[in-house]
Amino acid sequence: MKKFMILAASLLLFSVTSAYADNDRPIQFNQLPEAAQQFINTYFPDQKVSFAKEERDFMEVSYEVMFTNSIKIEFAGNGEWKEVKCKYSTLPEGIVPEQIVNYVNTNFQGVSIYAIDRGYRDVEVSLTNGLELTFDLNYNLIDMDD
C-alpha cells in the first residue's frame, strides 16, 4: 500500500508539473516587465509589435516579442534582454557591448552584427558574413563558428 501511495503521489506531481510546463500565453505590450518595455521603447521606438507572449517553463518565466519586420527579442522574467535577432537588418547601436563592436570593426571590416544572444557564461553574436563569435563575460573571444 505504501508503494502504491508513493507511486500515486509521484504520478500526480508529474501530471501537475507537466501541465504547468510549456504554458505559453499571448500578452499585450503593457503586460511586459517595465525593463522590457523600456528596452523596446529605447532601441525600437518606431517598430510595431506583431506578437508578444509569456512563456512559463517549470519555475522560469520569460517573454518573447516579435515585430512586424521579423525582429525578435527574448527577455528574462525580470525584463532583461536575453536575445535580439534582426532578421533583415543590423542591431541598433547601443545593444552590443562596445568591446565586441570594436573587435568586429577591427577584425571584420564592412561586416555588421545582426543578432546577439546573452547567456550566463558568454555572449554570442551573429555577423552578416555568416560567422558566429562567442565572447566570455570579459568580452574575450573564446569561439568562432561559420
Tell me the role of every PLM-derived stretch:
Residues 1-24:
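Bacterial Sec-dependent N-terminal signal peptides
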Residues 22-146:
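Interaction-mediating elements
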